[in-house]
Amino acid sequence: MSFGKRGAGEGHPARSLLPPPPIEEAGAPVARMKVANAGGIDKGFIALAAGVVIVSAGAALAAPSVLDMFGSQQVRPIEIVVAGLDRNQAKVALAREAFPDGEGRAFMSALQTNFPTDHDRLLDVLADEAMDGGDRDALLQEVGRWSVEFVVPNLSAIGRSGADGFDELLNIGGDALAMVEKTAGCTADKLEAFVSNPTNLASAMSYGSDSYKFSMQTSAKLVNLAARGRGAPPVSAEFRREDEQAVMTAVMGLMMDEQIMGLMSANGRGNFEGNQQALRKIDICKMGRSIIYKLKRLPFGTKERMLAMGTQGLDKMPAGV
C-alpha cells in the first residue's frame, strides 16, 4: 500500500466508490474461434483468474490516501500528537490519533483484535517515524510498507478463507477498477495522459486523495480474512474434473466479451502498428469486470480450491518481491 508524498494539509471526505453493474451478455456478437486445449483445463485462464484474485489485493494496497473526518472532530497534526511524549506514550497516542477517521479506526481495531503483536509492531514503526518528525503522509508510507510485510506471510491463511474469501478479494478487485476508472481512465491513452501530468500524480498520491478510505477498508478486510483463515483446515489446491468444466464454461463465456474479443483480434493481426492501436483502445476496467463477473459465478468448491491454488507457496516469497 503506497501512500503519497508528505503534505501539511489535512484531507476531506470522499464519496464512497460503487462498482458499476455487471456487463450484460444478451445480444453479444457471435464469433467463430478456435479454443486451445478444448478438452481440458485452460491453464492460461487459471493463471489469469488467480492473478485477478491476488493482484486485486495488491492493487488495493497500492492505492493512495484521504482522511475521512466525522462531524466536528479535529484532526491534530502528528507533531502535536507526539509533542513532549516518550516512545511508549507516543504509541498510545498514535493508536488513537494516527488515523482518527472511521476507516482508519476500523483498520487499527481489526489489527489489534486479531493480531495484537502485529498491531504493537506497527505502532513501534509509527512512533519512531512520528518522533523523527514525520507527518501523516510519512506514517501512511510506513503503513504501506508494513502492509506488504504483513500480507505476504499471511497469504496461506487468506487462502484458507474459502469461497467467501475468494468473493471478498474479487470485490476488492472491482473497487480497485472503479478507482482507476474514476481517477485516470481505463484505456492506455487515458492512463498515459494521466501519469504524464505531474500535477495529477501529486494529487492522486497525496494525503487527502480519494483512495484513502478505500485503502483502509481494504487493509481491514485483508486482516479479517487472514484472521478467518488462520485457524481453518487446509484446503486442497488440486483441481477436480468439475472444476475444469466450470472454468472452461467461464472461458467460453468470456470469449464473447467485447473487450476480450478485441484483445484476441488485435493479437491475431499481422500489422504491428495496427495491433498496437487496437490494444490501446481496450478498456481494461470493462475487461476486468467481465472476468470478475464470471469468476463470481464459479461453484463454491471451485472457488475454494482456486483461492488455495492462487496463494499456495506465495507466503514463502520475500516481502519485497
Question: Residue spans of the language-model regions?
Answer:
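Intrinsically disordered, low-complexity segments enriched in small/polar and acidic residues
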Residues: A36, E79-A83, A308
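Juxtamembrane low-complexity tails/linkers enriched in Ser/Thr-Pro and polybasic
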Residues: E24-G40
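Hydrophobic membrane-insertion alpha-helices, especially the h-region
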Residues: G44-P64
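Charged, low-complexity interaction regions
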Residues: M131-R136, P233-V235, F300
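N-terminal Sec/ER secretory leader and immediately downstream segment
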Residues: P64-F194
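N-terminal targeting leaders characterized by basic, low-complexity, disordered sequences
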Residues: M1-E25
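Extended amphipathic alpha-helical interaction segments
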Residues: G174-N271
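A cross-kingdom marker for long, charged
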Residues: M69-F70, M255-V321
